[in-house]
Design a protein with these regions (language model features):
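Conserved small-residue
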Residues: 37-43, 54-146, 254-256, 261-264
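Outer-membrane beta-barrel signature, preferentially recognizing the C-terminal barrel domain
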Residues: 1-6, 34-58, 145-151, 279-288
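Outer-membrane beta-barrel transmembrane strand signature
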Residues: 6, 93, 97-168, 207-223, ...
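Membrane-embedded beta-strands that build the outer-membrane beta-barrel scaffold
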Residues: 5-13, 47-55, 63-71, 152-158, ...
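Flexible, solvent-exposed coil segments and beta strand-coil junctions
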Residues: 23-34, 89-90, 129-138, 206-217, ...
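Extracytoplasmic gating/loop element in the C-terminal half of outer-membrane beta-barrel translocons
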Residues: 172-254, 267
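Membrane-embedded beta-barrel scaffold of Gram-negative outer-membrane proteins
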Residues: 1-30, 60-63, 70
Length: 296
C-alpha cells in the first residue's frame, strides 16, 4: 500500500498472583481477627487492534487517520489462603464496592432498587433477593463495574498547503460510575436548623428522598462516553527576512466536548473515595491556547 496502511492485532491473557488482601484468621493466631497478606489472584484477558492509514497524499494535501480498539475482561480468581466459598469478598473503604471471587475488580455492591408505576425510585424499598422477608446485607448484590469493556481511540491529521487541522477522540463503553453527589441529594440535607433552605442537586426534586439511600443501585449509572480530547488548528506563515526567520501559528482546545448519558459532572472524574466513585463538585476545565513558533 505504499506505506499508506499499517496495523497491529494483539491477543493477551495475563494472570497476576499474590496480590495483597485482608482475610480473616483464626482467633488467637494474631493480635487481630484479620491479616493483610499476599493471596489475591486476578486474570486479565483481551484483544487490542490498531490501524493507521493515509487516505490522501498529494502535493498539496495529506490526510492521516488512526484508529484503535481494545477489549478487556478482568476477573478475580482467588482472595483467601484456603478455598472458602462462603467468603463474600473484601469491601472497599467507601462501602459501595467489593472485591469478590468471580467478579471484576471494584464491582459495586448495592441493593436492587424498586420503582413505582411511573418509574420513580421508592424510598427505602429494595428487592428481597434471598426471599427471607428481611432487607439486610444478605440482599446486597454485585452490580456492574467502573472498568470499561471496550476502549476506542480515533485521531485525524489533515494538512492542506500551509494549514493543518488535527483532532483526537476517545470512547469508553460499558463502564459505570457511582454518583455520590446525587446520593447526597436528600430533603433532610437542605433543611437548615436555623430555618432556611440550603443548596442541593436537582435530583432531590425527582426522587423526593428524605433520607439517604446510598446503597441503592439507582446511583450506579452508565458512564459510557465519547470525548474529544484535543482539537488543533495551525498555519505555517513561511519564511521571511530573506529566509532567516520562519513563523508558525497554532490554536488549540483541550476537553472540547463529551457525549454521555451519565448524570454527573464528568464520566471520568475520580473522587477521593476511589475509582468509580464520583463525589467531585468541580467539572474538568476546558482549555484554550494560542501559540506562535519562531524558527531562526
Amino acid at each position: 500500500f505504499n506505506n499508506r496502511l499499517s496495523g497491529a492485532l494483539d491477543v493477551y491473557y495475563k494472570k497476576t498472583k499474590d496480590l495483597l488482601n485482608v482475610i480473616p484468621i483464626p482467633a488467637g493466631s494474631n493480635f487481630n481477627s484479620v491479616i493483610l497478606t499476599n493471596v489475591g489472584n486476578v486474570t486479565n484477558k483481551g484483544v487490542e487492534f490498531s490501524v493507521n492509514a493515509t487516505p490522501v497524499r498529494t502535493g498539496r494535501v495529506q490526510w492521516n487517520l488512526g484508529f484503535n480498539v481494545a477489549y478487556n475482561d478482568n476477573t478475580i480468581t482467588n482472595l483467601t489462603a484456603v478455598n472458602d466459598p462462603s467468603f463474600p469478598g473484601t469491601a472497599n473503604a467507601n462501602g459501595i464496592q467489593i472485591n469478590s471471587v468471580g467478579y471484576q475488580i471494584n464491582a459495586f455492591y448495592v441493593y436492587k432498587q424498586l420503582y413505582d408505576k411511573s418509574g420513580k425510585p421508592i424510598e427505602g424499598v429494595f428487592q428481597d433477593l434471598n426471599h427471607d422477608g428481611v432487607i439486610n446485607q444478605n440482599d446486597l448484590y454485585h452490580y456492574k463495574s467502573p472498568a470499561p469493556r471496550y476502549i476506542f481511540g480515533f485521531s485525524t491529521d489533515l494538512t492542506v498547503d500551509r494549514w493543518s487541522l488535527n483532532a483526537v477522540l476517545r470512547a469508553n463503553i460499558g463502564n459505570y460510575m457511582y454518583n455520590g453527589l446525587q446520593a447526597s441529594a436528600i430533603q433532610a440535607g437542605i433543611m437548615n436548623p436555623l430555618g432556611f433552605l440550603q443548596n442541593s442537586l436537582n435530583d432531590v426534586l425527582y426522587t423526593h428522598f428524605y433520607n439517604g439511600q446510598k446503597l441503592s443501585d439507582y446511583y450506579v449509572q452508565n458512564a459510557s462516553f465519547l470525548r474529544m480530547d484535543n482539537l488543533g488548528l495551525g498555519y505555517d506563515a513561511g519564511n521571511f527576512f530573506h529566509n532567516k526567520l520562519g513563523l508558525r501559528l497554532n490554536a488549540n482546545v483541550q476537553n472540547v466536548f463529551v457525549i454521555t448519558r451519565y448524570k454527573g459532572q464528568d464520566p471520568e472524574l475520580i473522587g477521593g473515595s476511589g475509582v468509580g466513585i464520583d463525589n467531585t463538585v468541580y467539572p474538568r476545565p476546558r482549555t484554550y491556547s494560542l501559540g506562535a513558533n519562531l524558527r531562526f
